[in-house]
Curated annotation (Swiss-Prot):
A Pfam family assignment: CSD
Provenance organism: Sinorhizobium fredii (strain NBRC 101917 / NGR234)
Main location as per UniProt: cytoplasm
Domain CSD positions: 5-65
Residue stretches spanning the membrane: none
Stored SUPFAM superfamilies: Nucleic acid-binding proteins
GO molecular function: DNA binding
Keyword DNA-binding: yes
Protein name: Probable cold shock protein y4cH
InterPro entries to which the protein is assigned, alphabetical: Cold_shock_CspA, Cold_shock_domain, CSD, CSD_CS, CSP_DNA-bd, NA-bd_OB-fold
Source species taxonomy: Bacteria, Pseudomonadati, Pseudomonadota, Alphaproteobacteria, Hyphomicrobiales
Length: 69
């Protein structure tokens, strides 16, 4: 199931940023690799985005993937 939110900030140089979910839950980490997999060049601050919340197999942390702008 897709979640929706707003890009809080994204730094392409650092390769990551955060999405503020519309449901008021904790901010979601987003890595540049997820942006590239989605075929997007960048995320803009304040941009609306749909995403899936996935758990990283290595770190166990949650992040956004399958992004749709």
């Amino acid at each position: 199931m897709m979640a929706t939110g707003t890009v809080k900030w994204f730094n392409a140089t650092k390769g990551f940023g955060f999405i503020q979910p519309d449901d008021g839950s904790a901010d979601v980490f987003v890595h540049i690799s997820a942006v590239e997999r989605a075929g997007l060049r960048e995320l803009k601050d304040g941009q609306k985005i749909s995403y899936e919340l996935v758990k990283d197999r290595k770190s166990g942390k949650m992040s956004a993937d399958n992004l749709q702008a």
